[in-house]
Amino acid sequence: MSDYMIRATAAEGQIRAFAATTKELVEYARAAHNTSPVATAALGRLLTAGTMMGPMMQGLTVTADSQGNVKGYVGNPEVMLPPNAKGKLDVAGAVGIGVLSVIKDIGLKEPYVGQTILVSGEIAEDLTYYYATSEQTPSCVALGVLMNKTNTVRQAGGFILQLMPGASEEVVSALETKIASLAPVTSMLDQGMNPEAILQDILGDMGLEIMDQIPVQFH
């Protein structure tokens, strides 16, 4: 299955949602840059986010456009670290402390620049914090890369859910309850769920409407 992302709304426009499957483009990036497993996981998470919102980060850089084209590189592609306390790739340790900068060129005289500190280095949590503090948009960001023992990419993808201004307390509560019970995004992908199925699982009871599907690729 080729990589792609979808855009959707739910709860009569009170929720905006994006979901993507990015295994092929993350594997392409891994092979192109000869990255270690933890570097692949870090870069892959940000590449996945880039297909949905286009960030740029020092040391780990991704650029993306509205057509689903994305590219990126790692400042230290050979970084190797032991697993974290949960036995997972230590992406937070590899990314370290720093600043997340998001630069958006939307056709104005100057690009929009938003910047926040890295709160964890796990990337999804950092982007959630960025949306809340820099863009004042309550969001849930989930990103994941699952590696094979042969250092190839088994699964990659993610989703972004955002509450729109004026979202009701009922919608907020329902979304929070659903998010709390979700499996990791790589587990959902490894079970054969595509982006549509993932958003259906999260927002199917809230009037999910899929707006469009966009192919994504490393370029």
Can you name each region flagged by the protein language model?
Residues S2-D212:
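Interaction interfaces in information-processing and related assembly proteins
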Residues F218-H219:
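Local cysteine-cluster metal-coordination motifs and their immediate loop/turn environment
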Residues P215:
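Flanking scaffold residues of small Cys/His-coordinated metal-binding clusters
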